[in-house]
Amino acid sequence: PNPKVAGKGAGILRAAGVQVDEDFMRKECDSLNPIFFHYITSRTPYVIMKYAMTADGKIATKTGASKWVTGEASRMEVQRLRHRCMGIMVGIGTVLADDPMLNVRLSEGNSPVRIICDSHLRIPLDSQICQTAKQYPTVVAYVPERESCIKDSCQEVYRQEKVCKLEQLGVRALPVSDRNGQVDLRK
């Protein structure tokens, strides 16, 4: 049950003389909003993972020439899923390899917040993600350098300048905890 209601709703209805049948078609009811019920019961985000690969287990040719591994129907389903989600997260490798937009291309589509895990702030300022950040909410999660890891003051100045430039483009640069030098997704 939702902690804001904490099971009191049924009691209120009964007190008002309304017949209440609980657990009637429970599985069917729960399937109407799996995202909400997942969050209420686990307090963790509902995650949908999109992954494409060829029959031989590859995601692209060796030259990187293959643009589409999935068909048109799969790409449309991705757009419908994106429309329903609050955020879409990719690693910096995807941004560097594909320069994606990560938006919804449906005529009446809400674009989710774009989240890029980029521990070392390698995202190019001229990437489609950065260039459209004022149009689509964008967060770049990065790991701030620890004092012991900074080789010289120029390195830290560069990072601070990069954060400023990202923010000028409309990107929210979010310093986060690290796990083995990578963005810690559990925090």
Place the predicted regions along the sequence by residue.
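Active-site ligand-binding patch in enzyme domains
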Residues: H38-S42, Y46-A55, I59-K187
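Zn2+-dependent cytidine deaminase-like catalytic core
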Residues: P1-E28, V113, R146-I150
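Hydrophobic, well-ordered secondary-structure segments
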Residues: A10, R26-N33, R75-R82
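Histidine/acidic-residue-rich, glycine-tolerant segments that coordinate divalent metal ions
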Residues: P3-G9, E28-I40, K67
